[in-house]
């Protein structure tokens, strides 16, 4: 028997229309580095999104399902594209500006982007790629920047504001099947070519609902959200859509992602919640420790992308009164997989054991742990296996190209359709996930597993260590052993023996690294994670000055 409920499609245009009308006075605030940030109300964003849709459709001929690329920072114009492009029936394709040029060109060509919106400050990045992007017919420049490098390009160059000027501020948004594609984001491609994840209107909508729940980020009207995580990375973790839905204003940092301007914009604009990878927050914490700022407005910072060192969580809370919330997700999970809030009634030191985990899964995300023989493991907090997930905002395949079939590689999807995350961890009986490592980063030493993440977190708790990465390197006797790569804090001079002794207070002796090296900075991927494949290559090529301790 079918229900008597209405079947209304859950689409991005509904988020746009709702935010622009019900929450029309909320603002998208773009930091400019000048005395006053740039402000646009949600109502203005709605009108300009309609103008953008008219420009793309009427002037540039963008059709249904066509991918439109954006090479942009987090700013109000990017928000207009976020909402306007999917609402008109096209597909928003955010381009990761931190990818190597050859990968960026591959992605644009694979998606067959014909129109690319680019911030003027990013023209030096796009211009050299254009000769390798034969299908790009239109480049729309957003904001100031030297356009000379675009002279002579095969693509027509347009000015964003001129393109929008005089166009209708209302667009008759089409009724779209909620299962249709709304946005496209490619993984960072640390192994092989990047893989495209196509988000549906429905997945973005229900993901936004989840982001706004109390068990996630609890956004509401009156909040100001600061997505430091880029809009080109997994939809800025869903904050733009969720904020527009809830009526929470948005503080967009544009290109000002360094610790000092972040601290200044927090003190000036007063956001209530922020989201970024650990390396961003580590820099901000050091800035706040060095120079006192009024950041009492910031009740929560969300940390994801890689494991959050407990020392970072305690530093924010104990020295600045800012609560850190640990979360886990990936491009394929939209990205909200789980968020770490302690159970009700838990306080004091007991809560830290829960907050250090990746958290619990919401009702819409199912999870299981799979052992080395393919068996499902119990949720007992001890059995470690590869995490697999499924749910309404979890990818079931990768984009195979405009004429290609969806891709379901066996190493990424199980025979029964679950996403194989590549993360190894445990789950407690009450559902708290603790990730011990990436499957490819676990150090397999003498038949035992050593967690690189655990060693890194303990090392970064030492006051003389700013960053630490641990990777597996070949060992004749044990197969693999850990190599500790550290970045020393400014002015700190701890020796390797001291760091090893400090680590020895936290882990078993057989887990302690014998090989140590100090570097100016740990190489990072395009989304701010430690790039361990680079460290392994540097070690193999003899590029690291390694000290051997016995």
Residue ranges and their predicted role:
Residues 321, 351-355, 393-422, 439-440, ...:
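Conserved ANL (AMP-binding/adenylate-forming) active-site segment centered on the GW(Y/F)…HTG consensus within
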Residues 245, 271-276, 286-353, 366, ...:
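Gly/Ser/Thr-rich phosphate-binding loop
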Residues 99, 105, 116-120, 391, ...:
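AMP-binding/adenylate-forming catalytic core of the ANL superfamily
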Residues 59-63, 167-179, 184-226, 238, ...:
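Conserved adenylate-forming
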Residues 28-75, 79-83, 100-108, 159-162:
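Conserved AMP-binding/adenylate-forming core of the ANL superfamily
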Residues 364-389, 429-430, 492-496, 531:
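Conserved beta-loop-beta connector loops within the AMP-binding
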Residues 205-224, 234-272, 287-288:
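Conserved AMP-binding/adenylation subdomain of ANL enzymes
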Residues 87-165, 176, 277:
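Structural core segment of the AMP-binding/adenylate-forming
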